[in-house]
Amino acid sequence: MSPAIAAIIVSYQSASTLDACLLRLREARDIAEIRVVDNDSTDGTLEIVQRHASADARVRFIANPDNPGFAAANNQGVADSQAPWLAFINPDLMVGPETLALLRERALSLGDCVLGVE
């Protein structure tokens, strides 16, 4: 069995793209955890994540009462994850069903490295 992947999304006023992003992540191979860390959105982001969380236990929402910034929010997502592989996903990214699993497999074949998608 391949090591699990945690997808970490930092959102701020991302309601217009987050629903589609979460749908695709939920369908992606080997995604064990989906963490959405929100930096005090007021555009309906919470309702979108709650709907996905009620349908899929892998989705968890971390709501910040203010906007601590992108890096701090990513660190919160990491702290809430248990998976050995982390994927930092922007809320407007639409991942393919195999993309993250293939990146992980490539990284495993290369040894210690960092990969990205262009």
List each model region and its residues.
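Cell-envelope/extracellular polymer assembly enzymes that use nucleotide-activated donors
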Residues: 4-6, 33
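Short, acidic, metal-binding catalytic loop of nucleotide-sugar glycosyltransferases
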Residues: 23-32
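Conserved donor NDP-sugar-binding/catalytic core segment of glycosyltransferases
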Residues: 94-118
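Acidic donor-diphosphate engagement hotspot in glycosyltransferases and nucleotidyltransferases
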Residues: 21, 45, 74, 82, ...
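Acidic helix N-cap motif at the loop->helix transition within catalytic regions
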Residues: 17-19, 43-52
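Short aromatic/hydrophobic "clamp" motif used to bind/position activated sugar donors
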Residues: 86
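Glycine-rich, basic loop-to-helix element that forms the pyrophosphate-binding segment
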Residues: 63-81
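A conserved acidic beta->alpha catalytic loop
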Residues: 38-47, 66
